[in-house]
């Protein structure tokens, strides 16, 4: 029976847009997708959304290293991420970016409401500054020893060992990740969110019983140690949204990142021309359900800051957080050197998506436990469960139905009571899917698969097929096997979308949860084709080797204009205004005796002549070709005495040097002596 339809909004944590999706990411997205697909099968209205987390200094610096703009980098990463998720059949309704108009507007709205309600405080702080790079260091670009648990090599905003959050200035023996230098202290005005004002509300939310026990217990520890005001601003240079009425100050990435859930949903509503659903889902008294699937490393932000921000800006809070653990491979942390740090795209070159979806699902529960991807066990389990128990059930019976009965199933069930046992299991299996006890659901389904295969073994259709006058028995036995297979695949449909499509094509019928009580009787199925292939350890070995090769390729140095010559330290407008750039006509150009690099240029500034030595000879072997051409020069550079004479300025050129030097020229119409601004 179809349940009362609910309105549900589901999100996954936003992948950071500076790297590829790997198997650690995929645990969460598979877990959420299985749950979402089950909810859709039960008739609920589900909106499943995600986005790239696209702001912060790490993105700014990596784009600089790659020689591209941050916008270009996050655009490329978004396409890569979406391709990976589509490859794993993650059924998002919308995938957006935090670097969007929707997210900017919502971030400014929430900030403004918090400020108007008195929850934003200003104060001057002492901040770590990299004296070598000339920039304030964001949290993730300082490493040191955690001030709480004393674990070494921890980032400046939170400890990955004990989960504590703190200020970078609290780190013991901090070092700049950018240069390795020891940071110095500098003062800067920052904006703070008054988290302690929400302590009572957050404790009540914790005690509501909705959160996982492990999450609630951890939150209680944080309450007992006392909540602190949260620094939500960062200084330029920074890639993100500038804070309204605060030039040079930007929203910290963790302020606008969770707002990205709202921004992605707003974008989806706008695409649909839906003007009501956004408010319906996000208003303070909304009766829609909101669930965030997240990893245990970001519980602090989602269980404290996020609900407090929503409460303070008059939006609804999450219905629940569904928190999972980490992924290990072969019992250890994923390793690039061992080839177990595996990208999603690499996996799909060696295995199908359903195989990993099944293995993760079989190991997941509602607890925050780490999941180990044991690659040998993975091969054994996929072959034993999907191939031997489930798909084999169909192949053992379909051949007889196709060949002997033209694909038509029997008019009656051979064993109605056995069939009822299978359909009665829907309640237990459905509850397991609902409560995210995925491993339990798989165990229940595989136990039924064992029963179904025992039935076929006992009935032995291959023996019956050879006995005269038993065609009706043969049809009934095989039809029973196929109907049991159909029920099993209906239960597995949230997990195995690709296999389910093939099964639906064979059965000539959709796998519908609410239709399992009605078996397929006198129903024509299509010709059976192989549904799933066995896998082996040779594929695993190839996967691991490919991952190692990718690491080697990624280690190759990045080249490009910005990578080879990084942008210099930011200067003020007043500094720039001191440089006097002028259009100059090249009146004469000649070689310099005794130099294989220099040309002597005579420049006309429209009433004043200048003598300039320029190191452009390698790119302009015929100096006469430059005569009559206009260029741009620094006119107020102090004269420089050289052994060939005095150079009275500098002409502007681009390129890395050698033969790749390109003299700059103004557009037609510019006149000698005109200022370049």
UniProtKB/Swiss-Prot annotation:
For this UniProt entry, the molecular function terms from Gene Ontology, in alphabetical order, are:
ATP binding; metal ion binding; methionine-tRNA ligase activity; tRNA binding
Segments carrying motif 'HIGH' region? 15-25
Listed SUPFAM superfamilies: Anticodon-binding domain of a subclass of class I aminoacyl-tRNA synthetases, Methionyl-tRNA synthetase (MetRS), Zn-domain, Nucleic acid-binding proteins, Nucleotidylyl transferase
What Gene Ontology biological process does one annotation of this record name?
methionyl-tRNA aminoacylation
Q: Name one GO cellular component term.
A: cytosol
**Key words of the record:** Aminoacyl-tRNA synthetase, ATP-binding, Cytoplasm, Ligase, Metal-binding, Nucleotide-binding, Protein biosynthesis, RNA-binding, tRNA-binding, Zinc
- Give EC number(s), comma-separated: 6.1.1.10
Q: Which species?
A: Salmonella paratyphi C (strain RKS4594)
Which residues bind Zn(2+) per the record?
A: 146, 149, 159, 162
Q: Which cofactor does it need?
A: Zn(2+)
Name this protein carries in UniProt: Methionine--tRNA ligase
Amino acids binding ATP? 336
Query: What's the record's note on cofactor binding?
Result: Binds 1 zinc ion per subunit.
tRNA-binding domain span: 575-677
| Catalysed reactions listed for this entry | tRNA(Met) + L-methionine + ATP = L-methionyl-tRNA(Met) + AMP + diphosphate
Superkingdom is Bacteria
Function of the protein: Is required not only for elongation of protein synthesis but also for the initiation of all mRNA translation through initiator tRNA(fMet) aminoacylation.
Where does the record place it?
Cytoplasm
Q: Is Magnesium among this UniProt entry's keywords?
A: no
Similarity-based family: Belongs to the class-I aminoacyl-tRNA synthetase family. MetG type 1 subfamily.
Where can the motif 'KMSKS' region be found? 333-337
Q: Which Pfam families match?
A: Anticodon_3, tRNA-synt_1g, tRNA_bind
Subunit comment for this entry?
Homodimer.
